[in-house]
Each structure stands twice: as structure tokens, then as C-alpha cells.
Amino acid sequence: MKVPYAFATNMATTFKLSTMILPQLEQGIHGPQIAGMMFFDDNIFALRKNDPIGERLSKVAKEQNILLMVCDQCAVRRDLAEGTFEQCGTGQVKASGLVDGVVAGCFPQLYEALAGNMPDQVITL
């Protein structure tokens, strides 16, 4: 089974990702293949450069070919992207100040990125 995660609820990255999902991925015991992870709202803060969670996740994502994407509008609002609100959803916003491998985008970019690695289910946390 192949799944992407959408981290949309309060503290999803600081609790569910960092204490459950990430350790399981690091140990190779998580189960399904992870196609990607999409981060919304304050959940993107876990991906800031030098954040321990983000740095660990960046390493795992590179090893396991996991897409890491932040909501472009969420990143612009938090000064973690280069671009304007008018560019959101177009693919023109670039992630900035985040760990290696993170891209910024909206649903069109997410769908395009996952098209070559189509998931079976989507899990929103």
C-alpha cells in the first residue's frame, strides 16, 4: 500500500510525525510506502532548517524517495518561502529556510508530484 500524509491539524508534526511516524520510518517498520507528505499551517515549522524533526525527516525522505511539500500560502505567510500570494497555486513560490528537499506548492503541484507515484489512500492528520 502507498499513502501520502497531509499534516493539517494542530500539532500533527510535533506529536504524530515526530513521535510515531518518523521513528517507524527510520527503523523500517512503518508499514506502507510513503509517497509524500504535505504540511499545512504551523506544521511547516517542523521543517525549518536545523530543526531536529525536519533534519531527520529530510534524511529519511531522501533515502525513501518521499515528497516533502509545504503549502505555498502557509509558507509565504510565515516567511518560509519566496513569492507572493498571487503566485500561490502556480508553482512559482519557492521554499526558503527549510530543510533540504522541501518544495512549496498547492494542490495542483501536489497532484502533479504524486502522479508518477500514485497513492492508494490519503491520510490526513
Over which residues does each language-model region extend?
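Mid-chain, well-packed structural core segment of small domains
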Residues: 56-108
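Histidine-anchored nucleotide/phosphate-binding helix
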Residues: 14-32
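Short, glycine-rich nucleotide/cofactor-binding loops
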Residues: 3-19, 43-50
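C-terminal binding/interaction regions
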Residues: 117
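A generic structural motif
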Residues: 30-35, 66
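A short beta-strand-loop structural module common to alpha/beta enzyme folds
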Residues: 33-44
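Internal active-site segments that recognize and position negatively charged phosphoryl groups
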Residues: 121-125
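Charged helix-capping and loop-helix junction motifs
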Residues: 20-22, 51-56
